[in-house]
């Protein structure tokens, strides 16, 4: 709680103080959700690619984290990019459909899921990898 006050941040009644403090500490440490998930995926899959392009011929889509051999697209969702505006939401759905038609499995995770349950997120990714490899 002291970190929150020292940084001049405000906590609403809807934000539990422990959660707000944890988020503040992570941000101060430079631990953004994409960095945390990238480190976890890369540790298990050295062939993983970040900001992957070329998944859909003729489209300039960029995948946050891609396992190209398995055709698994891992996306980190945040309201600042996905859903703040209706047009962005529609574009995101169109993009996901194009990826699916091209044979990609799209897994979407929020920052909250990554920070609160990285082990569960990693387990979901591993299950998808095993399914894609036919195991």
Regions found by a protein language model. Give the residues of each.
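Amphipathic coiled-coil/heptad-repeat helices and related helical stalk/stem segments
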Residues: 34, 58-59, 92
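Solvent-exposed, charged helical/coil patches
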Residues: 1-49, 133-135
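Active-site metal-binding core of divalent-cation-utilizing nuclease and nuclease-like domains
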Residues: 42-73
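Basic, amphipathic alpha-helical patches used to engage nucleic acids or provide basic targeting signals
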Residues: 62-128
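Conserved short-loop catalytic and cofactor-binding motifs
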Residues: 25, 53, 83, 87
């Amino acid at each position: 709680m002291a970190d929150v006050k020292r940084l001049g941040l405000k906590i609403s009644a809807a934000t539990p103080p422990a959660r707000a403090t944890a988020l503040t500490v992570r941000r101060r440490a430079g631990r953004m959700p994409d960095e945390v998930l990238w480190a976890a995926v890369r540790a298990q899959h050295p062939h993983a690619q970040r900001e992957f392009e070329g998944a859909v011929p003729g489209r300039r889509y960029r995948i946050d984290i891609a396992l190209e051999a398995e055709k698994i697209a891992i996306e980190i969702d945040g309201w600042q990019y996905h859903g703040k505006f209706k047009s962005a939401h529609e574009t995101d759905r169109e993009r996901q459909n194009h990826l699916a038609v091209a044979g990609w499995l799209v897994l979407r995770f929020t920052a909250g899921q990554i920070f609160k349950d990285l082990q569960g997120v990693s387990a979901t990714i591993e299950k998808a990898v095993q399914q894609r490899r036919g195991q």
